[in-house]
């Protein structure tokens, strides 16, 4: 008489896999096995051994598309022209430099400096992508008209403080369709792109 094989459900298959993983975990702990599955010599060529390199922060994943385009352009053009001693390009990370202390918020519960979307302290260059909320009242961003006026005040304060500290601040309005060309046309006369052909 032929034997019948009972089908295994997906749930049962998942439980079997989990059980096998638990057994493997217990065996490796009991034997005192530590480390990874690969030998160092096999993965070593893929490891960046320099002391400084760029790691995207979690907040960067939340940046607007315009801000990401600005940062990508800056890193791939200006950043590669101005490298650190290890040959890493200037990263143009988001920053809250000390010279951008907001007199309204800096005294409350810690440090609330104004932020620059893409900033290089070495080059004294900042790029700010300004969404529509910087130019008009948008309920999603502003709870009332006063919040919108505060936004405009902070924008003007940032411009003045950058100017007072000899930091070039380039603002990219949300209406710009070709951000790389816009930035190129702003940066070229300032001498940041002189080495580019």
UniProtKB/Swiss-Prot annotation:
Organism encoding this protein: Invertebrate iridescent virus 6 (IIV-6)
UniProt topology in membrane: Single-pass membrane protein
Major place of residence: membrane
UniProt-recorded name of the protein: Uncharacterized protein 307L
Highest rank taxon of the organism: Viruses
Lineage, highest ranks first: Viruses, Varidnaviria, Bamfordvirae, Nucleocytoviricota, Megaviricetes
Any single Gene Ontology cellular-component annotation: membrane
Family: Belongs to the IIV-6 307L family.
Keywords: Membrane, Transmembrane, Transmembrane helix
Record localization: Membrane
Listed transmembrane segments: 7-27
